[in-house]
Amino acid sequence: MDAVTPDAARIAAAINTKPSREEAEAAVRTLISWAGDDPTREGLLDTPKRVVKAYEEWFSGYDADPLKALGKTFEDVQGYDDMVMLTNIDVESHCEHHLAPIMGVAHVAYLPSKAVVGISKIARVVEIFSKRMQTQETMTAQIADALTEAMEPRGVAVLVDAKHQCMTTRGVHHPNVSTITTTFTGEFRNDRDLKDRFMRLLERA
């Protein structure tokens, strides 16, 4: 499944029709009025500007290309071909259904075939996809797909463990529920021992 290319096309189309900052601020004022408050009172006067600025940060992943983040690789690794694993990468996202925060961590591993990538770049890929309106399932697959497309590894493993405030602070109000999603490709999918090793290493994280 290629979750990278279709998203890139949709995002490019959306950017071409992006509303102005003034239109975005006006939309925030409308929401404040709808919620029952006065957007012209002192405490809320600058709120639309602050919200739009916050959205620029929260959704900065739309302006970044995960494949470019993985563009530089290193082949001189003394023949290293075992698992490369990063644990506890912070995930700060928003659910696409309610725009409520998703907070958690991602654990990512891959088996290099031709080259390795700087470890910070893997964390950057997680950040790019998390800084978008997401479902956790889609984000998990996108991380694996980006690594696969950019590096052609022998396998990728991704596990995301997060809490969704659309469930913890509204609706059913279950604050202690975590959601875990996984994607395994290549040797991680086909080799049960390798998958088990990945899961055992997570216990030490």
Swiss-Prot record:
Pfam families cross-referenced by the UniProt entry: GTP_cyclohydroI
InterPro entries assigned: GTP-CH-I_C/QueF, GTP-CH-I_N, GTP_CycHdrlase_I, GTP_CycHdrlase_I_dom
Catalysed transformations (reactions): GTP + H2O = 7,8-dihydroneopterin 3'-triphosphate + formate + H(+)
Keywords from the UniProt entry: GTP-binding, Hydrolase, Metal-binding, Nucleotide-binding, One-carbon metabolism, Zinc
EC number: 3.5.4.16
GO cellular component, one term: cytoplasm
Pathway involvement of the protein, from the record: Cofactor biosynthesis; 7,8-dihydroneopterin triphosphate biosynthesis; 7,8-dihydroneopterin triphosphate from GTP: step 1/1
SUPFAM superfamilies named among the record's database cross-references: Tetrahydrobiopterin biosynthesis enzymes-like
Enzyme class: hydrolase
GO biological process, one term: tetrahydrobiopterin biosynthetic process
GO terms, molecular function: GTP binding; GTP cyclohydrolase I activity; zinc ion binding
Iron-sulfur recorded as keyword: no
Binding residue positions for Zn(2+): 95, 98, 166
The keyword Metal-binding is annotated on this UniProt entry: yes
Self-association state and partner proteins as the record states: Toroid-shaped homodecamer, composed of two pentamers of five dimers.
Assigned protein family: Belongs to the GTP cyclohydrolase I family.
Name recorded for this polypeptide: GTP cyclohydrolase 1
Organism this protein belongs to: Maricaulis maris (strain MCS10) (Caulobacter maris)
Source organism phylogeny: Bacteria, Pseudomonadati, Pseudomonadota, Alphaproteobacteria, Maricaulales
